[in-house]
Amino acid sequence: MDFFKKILRRNLMSKKITLIVLAFFASIFLVACGKSPDVTANANGTKIGDTIKIGVNMELTGAVAAYGKAEQNGIKLAVDEINKAGGVDGKKLELVTKDNKSENAEASTSSTNLAIQNNVNAIVGPATSGAVAAASLVSQKTGVPLLTPSGTQDDLTVDANGTKKFVFRTTFKDSYQGKVLAAYSYNNLNAKKVVLYYDNASDYAKGIADEFKREYKGQIVTEATFASGDKDYQSALTKFKDLDYDAIVMPGYYTETGIITKQARDLGIDKPILGPDGFSDAKFTELAGKKNASNVYYVSGYSTNVALSDKASGFIEAYKKAYNTDPNMFAALAYDSVYMIAEASKDAKTSVDIADNLAHLKNFVGVTGKMTIDKDHNPIKAALMVKRDNGEEVSAEAVEIEK
């Protein structure tokens, strides 16, 4: 009998060791795969400690890295300034940065890690609407507010239940951009007939196009679409060339619209090209070519040609000193986002307090203008229409449209 007991104990011990080894390697595998922690683990928000921890969930590599890198620059500059001035309530701001690689799934994972593992008190980013939509679900579950500098999709801050308590934006909505494009093309450029050409694979572009169609008072001669990642637009552009119209309205990101503009100009199409804030990056000019990036107009939340507040000139000077280039819209919006979070962090004890304070932010003056957060967590502020010639911003006009 003792013999059989020894055998049984030996087998049980062997199985236990095997299970321990398997569990060890499984944990390594999950870490290697970037497995996210449980997003429900911190649903009541995070406490503010010795520092105010700001997570950065940004597109630093991948298809739209130009947006993310500009926003990262604006974020770092703002944090440096605030910390040099003594911080907030005597506490320094601390950055924790994650690269979402311009991928929506990675944006969700980045926010989860920032909220659960790093215990940040607020998150700035992502830059693009699809990534924000994915990351916002995490903020809603963890109680860590997300402030996107440039995510414009209308439903980012609201859902079927109403306003999302922990999701905010610093820029205007897609529908507002569509209204601005419709009014500016018809009234300012006297474009009574247009071609509408937009990215049908992008919710951002489709949202702007839909609102443009609702608001435009002129005739849309033809409506055509392209898809993110396309490289050859000759077929559609050749058809446009033979039509009678005054301008091309082209909702989309610079990754495609810069190439389309080059191919259009190469075909001899010299009509005005109008687009949303997705045009607002030097990469647009790089893809189109300086000469081709002329007679181009786009919506923007910022321009170095217009001082939207008394803070504008100081920001431009500081940014150029830090990065040896002029700031674009994305850098300016991200810079303002940090200052908004800093303002909302005053007297706050938790991330939930920061969210509550952001929701009641009024008459905040940033480099992108004066703004108040409305009931849907969108800023009430003016938009600009910027003109680009030979690859450079040559003018900008403030456009006020009823929202």
Q: Model-found features: residue ranges?
A:
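Hydrophobic alpha-helical segments within soluble ligand-binding/sensing domains
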Residues: 107, 168-193, 206, 232-234, ...
